[in-house]
């Protein structure tokens, strides 16, 4: 059976000036604050933001009663509010232009897990997510960059299959428990022998 050709498009764009020191410092600070793996994660979100802002700018050039502006503008705003990037009281295209990369980074699963107190740090949150300890609702999510919707935020918790979520302890914990039980069993045997003498 023939396969349809897939067209892939880039999900990020690199900066035009690679060694601009002010931008490098800002990116490093962002990567540290949000526990990002590399700069590409920042570039990906910048790329998404630039597409959203371009769409908003295009719609703002049209007349307020233009059906395209009404339909597409409301759809864009509704999508951003659902993700939690735009607040309920700022439902205007002008506010879309004021969005920053940090607003999107705040909505990542990695950041949300840390903010909810399930992890000790953002880096620990990333490890928990990639090791499949975190679930959103009933679905285990192992992608740290997963964008959490506002209505899903309250469903973030440890997965039922995770030792942190009350499931069977991990391999090392089981081994340590067995050793402890074995040691306490030996101590009890020695105590019995001492009593007999």
Curated annotation (Swiss-Prot):
MF term (GO), any: structural constituent of ribosome
SMART domains reported for this sequence: Ribosomal_S4, S4
UniProt KW Protein transport keyword: no
GO cellular component terms given for this protein: 90S preribosome; cytoplasm; cytosol; cytosolic small ribosomal subunit; nucleolus; nucleoplasm; small-subunit processome
CDD domains assigned to the protein according to its UniProt record, in alphabetical order: S4 (cd00165)
Primary role: Component of the ribosome, a large ribonucleoprotein complex responsible for the synthesis of proteins in the cell. The small ribosomal subunit (SSU) binds messenger RNAs (mRNAs) and translates the encoded message by selecting cognate aminoacyl-transfer RNA (tRNA) molecules. The large subunit (LSU) contains the ribosomal catalytic site termed the peptidyl transferase center (PTC), which catalyzes the formation of peptide bonds, thereby polymerizing the amino acids delivered by tRNAs into a polypeptide chain.
Protein name: Small ribosomal subunit protein uS4A
């Amino acid at each position: 059976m023939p396969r349809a050709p897939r067209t892939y498009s880039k999900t990020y764009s690199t900066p035009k000036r690679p060694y601009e020191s002010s931008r490098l410092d800002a990116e490093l600070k962002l990567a540290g604050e949000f526990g990002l793996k590399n700069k590409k994660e920042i570039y990906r979100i910048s790329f998404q933001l630039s597409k959203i802002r371009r769409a908003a700018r295009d719609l703002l050039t049209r007349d307020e009663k233009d059906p395209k502006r009404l339909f597409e503008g409301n759809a864009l705003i509704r999508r951003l509010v659902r993700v939690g990037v735009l607040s309920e009281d700022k439902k205007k295209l002008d506010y879309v232009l004021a969005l920053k990369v940090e607003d999107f980074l705040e909505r990542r699963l990695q950041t949300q897990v840390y903010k909810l107190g399930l992890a000790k740090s953002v880096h620990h949150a990333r490890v928990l997510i990639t090791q499949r300890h975190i679930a959103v609702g009933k679905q285990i999510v192992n992608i740290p960059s997963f964008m959490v919707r506002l209505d899903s935020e309250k469903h973030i918790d440890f997965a039922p299959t995770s030792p942190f979520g009350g499931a069977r302890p991990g391999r090392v914990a089981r081994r340590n428990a067995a050793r402890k039980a074995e040691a306490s069993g030996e101590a009890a045997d020695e105590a019995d022998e001492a009593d007999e003498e």
